[in-house]
């Protein structure tokens, strides 16, 4: 399948490299010409274990390319991923200017039906704002037919283990609302991720708003576990208890489990 990914950052490059590894034809587009030049010169603007080798292999086999040309990327991709940053504003809310700007740019070049996939971490309701940007651009060109479907497919990657997480996912969450294009989009996404569903169905289908909230809820749950264990570690120090013993005692409960129960420096990073 032909895939375009807008945003050659952490999520975009890992997604692009892994999809190319699965045999898809991938174009990654970024507005940063220096970053694209680095990628075309076999460099990487980020570090992730195994990504350099993955990219080199797929460059050599002609399955992944990099460009600054949005028109080329939109024309190429049957499925177009939006994987740009959504940094926090001063008030803590997500800054969606890059996501919405990308949607507007895609809309200017749409000529035939595309599946637009929100991969960025975005607030609930963002898909509808993306949809409006796309439709506004089509309206300006006098195009009334339905040339896109906006869906949500949040990422669940850990820095340092992103390739493993992508290639061996716990689950693949896809938010798709009922529409005239539902069957077409469902089939395309099933085909895209078919490699992961051969022995066990990993795709969880839901509506778009639920998929957007799932990503936020997962992040919040993990943050809660990490913060909770750091508080218990502080309490252990005060009371003379051994936090490692406490951790093992808590984790042995099947309702809790051992993952993300290690006290440490807290949480953060571009991929939580």
Predicted regions and their residues:
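Structural/interface elements that position substrates and couple domains in central-metabolism enzymes
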Residues: 1-272
């Amino acid at each position: 399948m032909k895939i375009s990914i807008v945003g050659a950052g952490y999520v975009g490059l890992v997604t692009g490299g892994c999809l190319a590894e699965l045999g898809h034809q991938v174009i990654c587009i970024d507005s940063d010409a220096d970053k694209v030049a680095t990628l075309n010169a076999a460099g990487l603007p980020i570090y992730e274990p195994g990504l350099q080798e993955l990219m080199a292999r797929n460059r050599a086999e002609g399955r992944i390319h990099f460009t600054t040309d949005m028109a080329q990327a939109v024309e190429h991709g049957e499925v177009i991923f939006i994987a740009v940053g959504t940094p926090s504003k001063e008030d803590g809310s997500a800054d969606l200017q890059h996501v919405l700007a990308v949607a507007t740019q895609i809309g200017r070049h749409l000529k035939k039906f595309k599946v637009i996939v929100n991969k960025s971490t975005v607030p609930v309701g963002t898909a509808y704002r993306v949809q409006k940007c796309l439709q506004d651009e089509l309206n300006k060109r006098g195009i009334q037919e339905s040339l896109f479907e906006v869906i949500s497919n949040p990422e669940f990657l850990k820095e340092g283990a992103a390739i493993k997480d992508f290639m061996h996912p716990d689950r693949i969450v896809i938010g798709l609302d009922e529409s005239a294009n539902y069957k077409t989009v469902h089939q395309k996404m099933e085909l895209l991720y078919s490699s992961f569903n051969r022995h066990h169905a990993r795709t969880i289908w839901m509506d778009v708003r639920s998929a957007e909230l799932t990503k936020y809820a997962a992040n919040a749950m993990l943050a809660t576990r990490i913060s909770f264990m750091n508080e218990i570690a502080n309490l252990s120090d005060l009371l003379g208890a051994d936090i490692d013993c406490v951790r093992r005692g808590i984790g042995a409960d099947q309702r809790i489990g051992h993952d993300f129960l290690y006290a440490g420096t807290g949480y953060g990073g571009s991929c939580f």
